[in-house]
UniProtKB/Swiss-Prot annotation:
Biological process annotations from GO: translation
PANTHER family per UniProt: 30S RIBOSOMAL PROTEIN S10 FAMILY MEMBER
Name under which the protein is recorded: Small ribosomal subunit protein uS10
Ribosomal protein is among the record's keywords: yes
GO cellular component: small ribosomal subunit
A GO MF term: tRNA binding
Subunit structure: Part of the 30S ribosomal subunit.
Function: Involved in the binding of tRNA to the ribosomes.
UniProt entry keywords in alphabetical sequence: Ribonucleoprotein, Ribosomal protein
Length: 104
């Protein structure tokens, strides 16, 4: 029989903000008696755009933009009811997207 675990996937455009949030979650889980596996860094998703600078002529003059999305996965292997309660009360920065799934 497989044991239940919680998988937390975090995404952000700023890697420092993301690492700070991961550290905060890990400290909370360890403080409440849980066991954490990770953080596992996922590949950075890069999106690029090429835009003409001028609205009419000068085709060779272009501007390039890039945005990077950083991701991390945390697996909480063993947890207590206090762990779940503490995770629900944690406040993370606005730029971090959190996705939580129960597995097992």
């Amino acid at each position: 029989m497989e044991q239940e675990k919680i998988r937390i996937k975090l995404r952000a455009y700023d890697h420092r903000l993301l690492d700070q949030s991961v550290k905060q979650i890990i400290e909370t889980v360890k403080r409440t008696g849980g066991v954490v596996k990770g953080p596992i860094p996922l590949p950075t998703r890069k999106r690029k755009w090429c835009v003409l600078r001028s609205p009419h002529k000068f085709d060779q003059s272009r501007e390039h933009f890039e945005i990077r999305e950083f991701s991390r996965i945390l697996d909480i292997i063993r947890f207590t009811p206090q762990t779940i309660e503490a995770l629900m009360e944690i406040s993370l920065p606005a730029g971090v997207d959190v996705e939580v799934k129960m597995r097992g």
